[in-house]
Amino acid sequence: MTQTAKKSPFSMNVDLMHGPIFKNLLLFMLPIFISSLFQQLYNTVDTMIVGNVLGDTALAAIGSCGSIYELLVGFGLGIGNGLAIVAARSYGAQDHDLLKKTVAGSLVIGLVASLCITLAGVLGLHPLLLMLDTPAEILDDAYRYILTIDLGVLVMFAYNLCAGLLRAIGNSVMPLVFLLISSGLNVVLDLLFIARMGMGVQGAAVATVISQGVSVVLCILYIILRVKILLPEKKHFRVGSHLYWELFSQSISMGLMSSIVSAGSVVLQYGINGLGTLVIAGHTAARKLFSFTSMPVMAMASACSTFVSQNCGANQPERVRKGMKEIALYSVAVAVLAVLLMQLGAEWMVQLISGSNEPVVLENGARYLRWNAPFYAVLGVLLATRYALQSLGQKVLPLFSSVIELVGKVVFVLFFIPKFAYNAVILCEPIIWCFMAAYLVLVYLHDPFVFPKKAE
């Protein structure tokens, strides 16, 4: 008998393979959006408390190593997303024995990968901060912060893998519930470690790791007690070489894609670090706000990954085509709302996040937000198409979009930032997004599953 996920009053599995496409995508996406909101709140609460309690220098310390954090964690998160894609395909094909083998193989690959990432960070973080020309007055704080985050990569990866597996079977609600609980804990620990115990920026990192650890424990307990379909037995760990290769290649493809994107951020951070502490502080606050305001398109792209994976497993290319069109229209609507929001309150939001009254901080942060907002439509199409191609099993071609981004950022750092300063930083990503989106859409339109060639 086919085993199914056990229902509970606290769970909600959205059927992405049947029914109205956009409505079901929204139902599935909304918990992911709220989860992303509170996940981002981890770092933003750190930023607000650090900025208001410890000042601009401490805020710049966290901002100066933000791109390194993305590089370390991004690879692990990419691996988790790649593993969840294979699980969603198995679920879409209704092969639940294969699904359990996929979970077992994912645990093995994920553990090894996260330990390797942690070791690489321990060995290379300080030299990398020096290479990025991090200002001397913030170097020690930046190193303590990012080293603590690096030591907690396994915890962060474990949550994202568990949450990804639940979403692979259509359950995006329970990861949200656990994250809401841990987010409240994160705020309490931030205030305790930074404001009361005087642990400085390192206290913010410790609070983030501990609170995410709580969400991991809750997620694992839920899977054990309620979602037996994701609970492999001893026999399922005898994963065949073909499945291991599929898991490895899919996860490495996603991981490399995330790493190349993050490497581009590291390169760009090098250019920003040379513009001074106040510019770094303004950019840090603006990037935090960008992470919030772009979240609707990023959450939809994440939902698109599960949607395409399941329908690929169920052999429904027509449904994939319709879904991608509706996601593109949704991205345009988000961009319009973002433009209105930035015109009304960009400076106020930058001041709220940074706790600063410095004109340089507020002006640069506000300009970054206003100039980027119209391009959210391009970003939405870019992200959804990239996730869709990965979900369709294309492991190489989507990587080239990340290479385009990396090369573009190198060009801006070498030639444009020295001449145009922060204006070049602001325009860098929107211009690159346009090139990446054009390339990815072209690849998508030639995908043999979504657009099969008609027999002559």
Q: Each PLM stretch: what is its role?
A:
Residues 1-29, 87-154, 196-252, 308-375, ...:
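Short alpha-helical transmembrane segments in multi-pass integral membrane proteins
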Residues 18, 22-41, 45, 68-75, ...:
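Residue-level signal for short hydrophobic patches within transmembrane helices
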Residues 27-46, 148, 159, 182, ...:
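Transmembrane helical elements of multi-pass membrane transporters/channels
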Residues 32, 36, 48, 85, ...:
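Transmembrane alpha-helix boundary and packing residues in multipass membrane permease domains
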Residues 37, 41-60, 129-136, 192-199, ...:
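Helix-terminus/linker motif at the lipid-water interface of multi-pass membrane proteins
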Residues 50-70, 136-141, 201-204, 243-250, ...:
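Interfacial/gating helices of multi-pass transporter permease domains
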Residues 59-119, 156-175, 282-346, 379-393, ...:
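Small-residue-rich hydrophobic transmembrane alpha-helices
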Residues 80, 149-167, 175-186, 204-217, ...:
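Short runs within selected transmembrane alpha-helices of multi-pass transporters and secretion channels
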